[in-house]
């Protein structure tokens, strides 16, 4: 066993923990199909959102961790439930009144309200694939409609007929009495209307491969369960799919957790082996409600990428997947700065166990680029943008190159992108919310002390010395808690409740420029 493999096995990073579960489930043998199948799912009722990105990003992290532990080939499929009947018209699509005419129709049988694809389902599938391709995910796309119609599930659908009573015995206790009288695992596709029907099944014939039901006119209708003439209810469908495709690893949101036992039992009833499963918590919007594709009540990936790199959003996805997290734009600077810190720690660390525990290893699948920001952070650049009040990144670069002559837009591309992100974020979220504190007599004394300190240092003074001097002024200013001292300074100088280490900020902004800023605040006791 190689040293790297030993270190990977010892790692407590959650992707490696999941990968070891998969390896343990194999009992030392590769599957008969010759590869490990990872599956993610997509409900194409609405556009791909940040949760879609999260599931696929996390899945690939586990897939790549498994590839560190084993030489068994792997494959990732993204399965679209595009044969589901439309239950609700999304609020964020064009021509909702047209779409409303096709309630209960399979998503791939509804005209595309965007006017670009064969159907609504095809449009959403295309958006999904474009979304996944944009971020470099390597996957195979599976359409539920295609799988059913092409006969890929036919063998398992016949087996569902053969095990009909056993499956009903499993499912019925989970329903209320009223639903028990109407439930059936099969949903016929109406030959007349094309709708996905939720009707009681009157008869079923495993040998003939058919089910019978009464239509809305009371007529007996017999249809084959194969060839796309029927679809399974979503709970049996989940378990059937695991058995048919021989899925080895599946991720799903907490909304599936209560039904995971049913999925697994149905898979076993059909002769399959349930996959290793991982349940992640759901993202919440600003009101603490579950984000939804159809409601469009979340930050989109494109929204995030307007203000930060993809690595920062991947870091957010990596952290604590089993914990519910709210999505706010305020999270972006924090995640960018955390990524910068973790990237630097990774390249300073030689111990592979520690490296494997670093999120950036999993974000970059082991090929971690080395970035250099020369001690500058997103938060610091936001503050620099605030005092400069500029939308011109060359203004920021004037301060950056003075602070660190080695840094240039051409040689420090990550830092250059960071300046662009900071300007956008400042313009959209900070500028209109700045609120400056009225300068009191106590504040005037503090500001004069800071001016005196600045007059006795130069741009060559180390930032730690500047920070200590600012701290010492605070110590003698009568604050019981220095937190409020710094908060007052941030509100006076930057119009914000929070801010950077002032030693670093002054070093970046420049001693003379900082003196001018302080003098300006002394002259203008309040700024609207």
Curated annotation (Swiss-Prot):
Enzyme class: ligase
Subcellular location: Cytoplasm
GO function term, MF aspect, one: lysine-tRNA ligase activity
Organism: Rickettsia prowazekii (strain Madrid E)
Binding positions for ATP per the UniProt entry: 293
Reactions that this protein is recorded to catalyse: tRNA(Lys) + L-lysine + ATP = L-lysyl-tRNA(Lys) + AMP + diphosphate
Lineage of the species this protein comes from: Bacteria, Pseudomonadati, Pseudomonadota, Alphaproteobacteria, Rickettsiales
Motif interval(s): 'KMSKS' region: 290-294
Keywords: Aminoacyl-tRNA synthetase, ATP-binding, Cytoplasm, Ligase, Nucleotide-binding, Protein biosynthesis
UniProt similarity note: Belongs to the class-I aminoacyl-tRNA synthetase family.
Entry's EC annotation: 6.1.1.6
SUPFAM superfamilies found in the cross-reference section: An anticodon-binding domain of class I aminoacyl-tRNA synthetases (SSF48163), Nucleotidylyl transferase (SSF52374)
GO biological-process terms attached to the record: lysyl-tRNA aminoacylation
Main location: cytoplasm
Database matches in InterPro entries: aa-tRNA-synth_I_codon-bd_sub2 (IPR020751), aa-tRNA-synth_I_CS (IPR001412), aa_tRNA-synth_I_cd-bd_sf (IPR008925), Lys-tRNA-ligase (IPR002904), Rossmann-like_a/b/a_fold (IPR014729)
Name listed for the protein in its UniProt record: Lysine--tRNA ligase
Gene from which this protein is expressed: lysS
PANTHER family: LYSINE--TRNA LIGASE
